[in-house]
Protein backbone atom coordinates (compact mmCIF):
# COMPACT_ATOMS: atom_id res chain seq x y z
CA UNK A 1 0.00 0.00 0.00
CA UNK A 2 2.65 2.55 1.05
CA UNK A 3 5.86 0.57 0.56
CA UNK A 4 7.10 2.70 -2.34
CA UNK A 5 6.46 5.92 -0.42
CA UNK A 6 8.25 4.59 2.64
CA UNK A 7 11.26 3.59 0.57
CA UNK A 8 11.26 6.96 -1.24
CA UNK A 9 11.31 8.79 2.11
CA UNK A 10 14.24 6.74 3.34
CA UNK A 11 16.13 7.19 0.07
CA UNK A 12 15.61 10.96 0.17
CA UNK A 13 16.82 11.08 3.78
CA UNK A 14 19.90 9.10 2.79
CA UNK A 15 20.54 11.43 -0.16
CA UNK A 16 20.38 14.51 2.09
CA UNK A 17 22.79 12.90 4.56
CA UNK A 18 25.17 11.86 1.77
CA UNK A 19 25.17 15.40 0.36
CA UNK A 20 25.92 16.82 3.81
CA UNK A 21 28.74 14.32 4.42
CA UNK A 22 30.29 14.94 1.00
CA UNK A 23 31.21 18.51 1.99
CA UNK A 24 34.36 18.06 4.10
CA UNK A 25 33.83 21.51 5.60
CA UNK A 26 30.72 20.23 7.41
CA UNK A 27 32.83 17.59 9.15
CA UNK A 28 35.35 20.24 10.23
CA UNK A 29 32.59 22.55 11.48
CA UNK A 30 31.15 19.81 13.69
CA UNK A 31 34.57 19.31 15.27
CA UNK A 32 34.99 23.07 15.68
CA UNK A 33 31.60 23.35 17.41
CA UNK A 34 32.39 20.46 19.78
CA UNK A 35 35.73 22.01 20.74
CA UNK A 36 34.15 25.44 21.21
CA UNK A 37 31.59 24.00 23.64
CA UNK A 38 34.15 21.84 25.45
CA UNK A 39 36.50 24.80 25.89
CA UNK A 40 33.64 26.86 27.29
CA UNK A 41 32.87 24.13 29.84
CA UNK A 42 36.55 23.85 30.80
CA UNK A 43 36.59 27.60 31.51
CA UNK A 44 33.40 27.55 33.60
CA UNK A 45 30.97 28.49 30.83
CA UNK A 46 27.61 27.01 29.89
CA UNK A 47 25.44 26.40 26.84
CA UNK A 48 22.11 28.13 26.25
CA UNK A 49 20.12 26.41 23.50
CA UNK A 50 17.04 27.59 21.63
CA UNK A 51 14.85 26.86 18.63
CA UNK A 52 11.22 26.89 17.48
CA UNK A 53 8.88 23.93 17.01
CA UNK A 54 10.84 20.77 16.22
CA UNK A 55 14.06 22.75 16.57
CA UNK A 56 12.93 23.73 20.08
CA UNK A 57 12.65 20.02 20.88
CA UNK A 58 16.15 19.49 19.46
CA UNK A 59 17.47 22.35 21.62
CA UNK A 60 15.92 20.71 24.69
CA UNK A 61 17.28 17.30 23.65
CA UNK A 62 20.79 18.74 23.35
CA UNK A 63 20.64 20.42 26.77
CA UNK A 64 19.23 17.25 28.34
CA UNK A 65 22.06 15.13 27.00
CA UNK A 66 24.60 17.67 28.24
CA UNK A 67 23.17 17.84 31.77
CA UNK A 68 22.13 14.18 31.93
CA UNK A 69 24.07 11.81 29.74
CA UNK A 70 24.59 10.65 26.19
CA UNK A 71 26.52 7.38 26.04
CA UNK A 72 28.81 7.60 29.03
CA UNK A 73 28.22 8.00 32.75
CA UNK A 74 30.06 11.21 33.59
CA UNK A 75 29.48 14.48 35.42
CA UNK A 76 26.73 16.66 33.98
CA UNK A 77 27.72 19.61 31.84
CA UNK A 78 26.15 23.06 32.34
CA UNK A 79 23.42 23.61 29.76
CA UNK A 80 20.01 25.27 29.71
CA UNK A 81 17.39 24.98 27.00
CA UNK A 82 15.44 28.23 26.90
CA UNK A 83 12.13 26.48 27.38
CA UNK A 84 10.62 27.66 30.66
CA UNK A 85 6.90 28.04 29.93
CA UNK A 86 6.38 31.00 32.27
CA UNK A 87 9.33 32.88 30.73
CA UNK A 88 8.15 32.14 27.18
CA UNK A 89 4.58 33.25 27.88
CA UNK A 90 5.61 36.33 29.86
CA UNK A 91 8.04 37.64 27.26
CA UNK A 92 5.72 36.74 24.38
CA UNK A 93 2.89 38.65 26.03
CA UNK A 94 4.85 41.64 27.31
CA UNK A 95 7.46 42.13 24.59
CA UNK A 96 6.63 39.83 21.66
CA UNK A 97 7.65 36.31 20.67
CA UNK A 98 10.65 37.64 18.77
CA UNK A 99 12.29 38.43 22.15
CA UNK A 100 11.67 35.17 24.05
CA UNK A 101 15.25 33.94 23.65
CA UNK A 102 17.16 37.23 23.66
CA UNK A 103 15.62 38.30 26.99
CA UNK A 104 16.81 35.04 28.55
CA UNK A 105 20.29 35.46 27.06
CA UNK A 106 20.40 39.01 28.46
CA UNK A 107 19.38 37.70 31.89
CA UNK A 108 21.68 34.69 32.32
CA UNK A 109 24.24 34.69 29.50
CA UNK A 110 27.82 35.54 30.38
CA UNK A 111 31.04 36.10 28.50
CA UNK A 112 32.50 32.70 27.61
CA UNK A 113 29.11 30.98 27.40
CA UNK A 114 27.85 29.48 24.14
CA UNK A 115 24.51 30.12 22.45
CA UNK A 116 23.37 27.09 20.44
CA UNK A 117 20.58 28.25 18.12
CA UNK A 118 18.65 26.08 15.68
CA UNK A 119 16.60 27.40 12.76
CA UNK A 120 15.91 25.31 9.67
CA UNK A 121 15.29 28.46 7.62
CA UNK A 122 17.93 30.60 9.29
CA UNK A 123 15.36 33.39 9.42
CA UNK A 124 13.74 33.00 12.85
CA UNK A 125 13.61 36.52 14.28
CA UNK A 126 13.78 35.31 17.87
CA UNK A 127 16.97 33.33 17.14
CA UNK A 128 18.47 36.30 15.30
CA UNK A 129 17.73 38.50 18.33
CA UNK A 130 19.27 35.87 20.63
CA UNK A 131 22.44 35.87 18.50
CA UNK A 132 22.64 39.66 18.76
CA UNK A 133 22.15 39.51 22.55
CA UNK A 134 24.76 36.75 22.89
CA UNK A 135 27.35 38.71 20.93
CA UNK A 136 26.66 41.78 23.08
CA UNK A 137 27.42 39.65 26.16
CA UNK A 138 30.69 38.29 24.71
CA UNK A 139 29.28 34.81 24.16
CA UNK A 140 30.20 32.48 21.31
CA UNK A 141 27.46 31.41 18.90
CA UNK A 142 26.85 28.10 17.17
CA UNK A 143 24.04 28.16 14.61
CA UNK A 144 22.43 25.11 13.08
CA UNK A 145 20.60 26.12 9.92
CA UNK A 146 19.33 24.79 6.63
CA UNK A 147 18.72 25.87 3.04
CA UNK A 148 21.08 28.81 2.32
CA UNK A 149 21.47 29.79 5.99
CA UNK A 150 18.96 32.62 5.65
CA UNK A 151 19.61 35.79 7.64
CA UNK A 152 21.72 33.81 10.10
CA UNK A 153 24.34 33.05 7.42
CA UNK A 154 27.66 34.49 8.52
CA UNK A 155 26.47 35.65 11.96
CA UNK A 156 27.68 32.74 14.09
CA UNK A 157 31.16 31.76 15.16
CA UNK A 158 30.30 28.31 13.79
CA UNK A 159 27.39 27.69 11.41
CA UNK A 160 26.48 24.12 10.55
CA UNK A 161 24.18 24.32 7.54
CA UNK A 162 22.16 21.55 5.91
CA UNK A 163 21.80 22.65 2.26
CA UNK A 164 18.34 21.18 1.72
CA UNK A 165 15.61 23.37 0.22
CA UNK A 166 12.47 21.26 0.41
CA UNK A 167 10.94 20.36 3.76
CA UNK A 168 12.27 21.20 7.22
CA UNK A 169 12.06 17.60 8.44
CA UNK A 170 15.06 16.54 6.36
CA UNK A 171 17.09 19.40 7.83
CA UNK A 172 15.99 18.44 11.34
CA UNK A 173 17.05 14.84 10.73
CA UNK A 174 20.60 16.00 10.02
CA UNK A 175 20.50 18.43 12.94
CA UNK A 176 19.73 15.65 15.42
CA UNK A 177 22.49 13.49 13.91
CA UNK A 178 24.92 16.39 14.32
CA UNK A 179 23.74 16.92 17.92
CA UNK A 180 24.49 13.29 18.71
CA UNK A 181 27.95 13.55 17.15
CA UNK A 182 28.60 16.76 19.11
CA UNK A 183 27.65 14.92 22.30
CA UNK A 184 30.04 12.09 21.51
CA UNK A 185 32.90 14.50 20.79
CA UNK A 186 32.20 16.64 23.86
CA UNK A 187 32.27 13.53 26.05
CA UNK A 188 35.59 12.49 24.46
CA UNK A 189 37.08 15.95 24.93
CA UNK A 190 35.84 16.45 28.50
CA UNK A 191 37.12 12.98 29.50
CA UNK A 192 40.66 14.24 28.75
CA UNK A 193 40.28 16.72 31.60
CA UNK A 194 38.98 14.20 34.16
From Swiss-Prot:
Catalytic activity: 2 D-sedoheptulose 7-phosphate = D-glycero-alpha-D-manno-heptose 7-phosphate + D-glycero-beta-D-manno-heptose 7-phosphate
Pfam families: SIS_2 (PF13580)
Compartment(s) of residence: Cytoplasm
SUPFAM superfamilies documented for this protein: SIS domain
GO MF assignments: carbohydrate derivative binding; D-sedoheptulose 7-phosphate isomerase activity; zinc ion binding
Pathway: Carbohydrate biosynthesis; D-glycero-D-manno-heptose 7-phosphate biosynthesis; D-glycero-alpha-D-manno-heptose 7-phosphate and D-glycero-beta-D-manno-heptose 7-phosphate from sedoheptulose 7-phosphate: step 1/1
Keyword Cytoplasm found: yes
Primary localization class, coarse: cytoplasm
Cofactors: Zn(2+)
Binding sites annotated in the UniProt record for substrate: 52-54, 65, 93-94, 119-121, 124, 172
SIS domain location: 37-194
Its EC number(s): 5.3.1.28
Cofactor note: Binds 1 zinc ion per subunit.
Annotated InterPro entries: GmhA/DiaA, Phosphoheptose_Isoase, SIS_dom, SIS_dom_sf, SIS_GmhA/DiaA_subfam
Highest taxon listed in the record's lineage: Bacteria
UniProt entry tagged with the keyword Transcription regulation: no
Gene Ontology biological process terms from the UniProt entry: carbohydrate metabolic process; D-glycero-D-manno-heptose 7-phosphate biosynthetic process
Record keywords: Carbohydrate metabolism, Cytoplasm, Isomerase, Metal-binding, Zinc
Binding locations of Zn(2+): 61, 65, 172, 180
Cellular compartments per GO CC: cytoplasm
Additional notes on this entry: The reaction produces a racemic mixture of D-glycero-alpha-D-manno-heptose 7-phosphate and D-glycero-beta-D-manno-heptose 7-phosphate.
Cited function: Catalyzes the isomerization of sedoheptulose 7-phosphate in D-glycero-D-manno-heptose 7-phosphate.
Subunit structure: Homotetramer.
UniProt xrefs under NCBIfam families: gmhA (TIGR00441), PRK00414.1 (NF001628)
Family, similarity comment: Belongs to the SIS family. GmhA subfamily.
Name this protein carries in UniProt: Phosphoheptose isomerase
Lineage: Bacteria, Pseudomonadati, Pseudomonadota, Gammaproteobacteria, Pasteurellales
